[in-house]
Curated annotation (Swiss-Prot):
PANTHER family: COBALT-PRECORRIN-5B C(1)-METHYLTRANSFERASE (PTHR35863:SF1). One of its GO terms (biological process) is methylation. Pathway: Cofactor biosynthesis; adenosylcobalamin biosynthesis; cob(II)yrinate a,c-diamide from sirohydrochlorin (anaerobic route): step 6/10. It catalyses: Co-precorrin-5B + S-adenosyl-L-methionine = Co-precorrin-6A + S-adenosyl-L-homocysteine. Keywords: Cobalamin biosynthesis, Methyltransferase, S-adenosyl-L-methionine, Transferase. Signal peptide: none annotated. It comes from Clostridioides difficile (strain 630) (Peptoclostridium difficile). Belongs to the CbiD family. This is Cobalt-precorrin-5B C(1)-methyltransferase. It is an enzyme of class 2 (transferase).
């Protein structure tokens, strides 16, 4: 794909999603099934408005079905699914097929006004998940439990492109007692899925077919943030009304090993702390416990809500400023300022009279979060815990113990 964007003066190539791959493979398979003509490329439209010309691989034409694949191309935003072959198998089967593990447009409530839905084409197209496509096992996702993890936009795209092929004369092609069965599969899917968020989201057995625009934007955090938010939504729909936010693995281990709390409450936020606390507020959580390494949360104490180093650092400056306000001597402040890592600074502080700085930072972190949530935060309890790399508790905000009690 030769579509480019410029970010910070650098040129990056766009890619296309697993949803676009599934759509292209489905359209190509249906075309070859109906016409019996072999093709090497296929055109599809994307919600982004960028048309794609996709190379069709691994073609298998038989008397009763056609299979083919499209290779996933993530452009310069390479993820776990990059270069995977996403397959579609098209076949015409009896309408009374007893296998109910399929999707149609009617599975998506928001499509009541969709043109494909109005045309009733959806009654004749059933999309299944095959080998390597995950199955949804938990509530809160955009697909019902027990269904294949094929998201709404790819499902719409598949139906739209097939309608472009068949038009509204599908009954004359399929007959009243037949339907078009599309099976999406990915032989590498089960292995690749282990490198994705799917296990945390309760999607088992393979990858998801995703993408809201059909196009992968390089250097974009949008997909990552959305995956994190989905876990928040999912836990809410499972009945949880309180949540523990941690940056990553270390936070999860701290919650499990040091606080002995159930990790069912834990959601990882990565560096997107501001985004995720806003999402927690939007979804309706009223009790939020935050636990993180001092190197991350010291930034939040100064109002930095994306903790990636490319966005902001200032860890030494924040620490020096708070120690100075406590009356620390210049020589000590200078040693802190020369530390390369916060862990190095922690070692100095732990052997000093200024250990209270950790609680001060925790309280400032809490107040910054409350300010970030604006006036709507009065009914939300937020408390903060800061720990070191060896999972030792360093500090906590004033009412942390009371909030921890509600998670026990």
């Amino acid at each position: 794909m030769e579509e480019y964007v410029y970010i910070d003066g650098k040129k990056y190539r766009r890619g296309y999603t697993t949803g676009s791959c599934a759509t292209g493979a489905s359209k190509a398979a249906v075309y070859m099934l109906i016409t019996k003509n072999r093709i090497n490329t296929i055109n599809i439209d994307t919600p982004k408005g960028i048309p794609l010309l996709l190379k069709v691989d691994n073609i298998n034409i038989s008397d009763t079905f056609v299979e083919c694949s499209i290779k996933k191309d993530g452009g310069d935003d390479i993820d776990a699914t990059h270069t995977m072959d996403i397959y579609a198998r098209a076949e015409i089967v009896a309408k009374n097929d007893k296998n109910k593990g399929y999707l149609t447009l009617k599975d998506i409530d928001s499509l009541s006004t969709n043109s494909e839905c109005k045309s009733e084409l959806y009654k004749f197209i059933r999309v299944y998940g095959g080998t390597g496509i995950g199955v949804v096992t938990k509530k809160g996702l955009s697909v019902d439990v027990g269904k294949p993890a094929i998201n709404p936009t790819p499902l719409k795209m598949i139906n739209h492109e097939i309608r472009k092929l068949i038009g509204d004369n599908f009954e004359s092609i399929l007959g009243n007692d037949k339907v078009l069965k599309i099976t999406i599969f990915a032989p590498q899917g089960e292995t690749v899925a282990k490198k994705t968020f799917n296990p945390r989201l309760g999607i088992v057995g393979g990858i998801s077919i995703i993408g809201t625009t059909g196009i992968v934007e390089p250097m974009s955090d949008d997909g990552w943030k959305k995956s994190l938010s989905i876990e928040l939504q999912m836990k809410k729909e499972q009945g949880l009304d309180k949540i523990i936010l941690v940056p990553g693995n270390h936070g999860e281990q701290f919650i499990r090993e040091k606080l002995n709390l159930d990790i069912k409450y834990v959601v990882r936020v990565s560096n997107f702390i501001g985004y995720m606390i806003k999402e927690a507020q939007r979804i309706g959580y009223k009790k939020i416990l935050m636990a993180g390494h001092i190197g991350k949360f010291i930034k939040v104490s100064a109002g930095i809500f994306n903790t990636h180093s490319k966005v902001a650092d200032a860890r030494s400056e924040i620490l020096v400023a708070n120690l100075a306000l406590m009356g620390a001597r210049y020589e000590f402040l200078n040693k802190i300022n020369q530390c390369v890592t916060t862990e190095e600074a922690v070692e100095l502080i732990n052997n000093s009279e200024y250990r209270e700085v950790y609680n001060i930072l925790s309280n400032k972190c809490r107040e910054r979060v409350k300010q970030y949530l604006n006036e709507d935060s009065d009914d939300i309890d937020v408390e903060v815990i800061i720990f070191s790399m060896d999972k030792s508790l360093l500090g906590k905000s004033d009412n942390t113990d009371d909030l921890v009690e509600v998670f026990i």
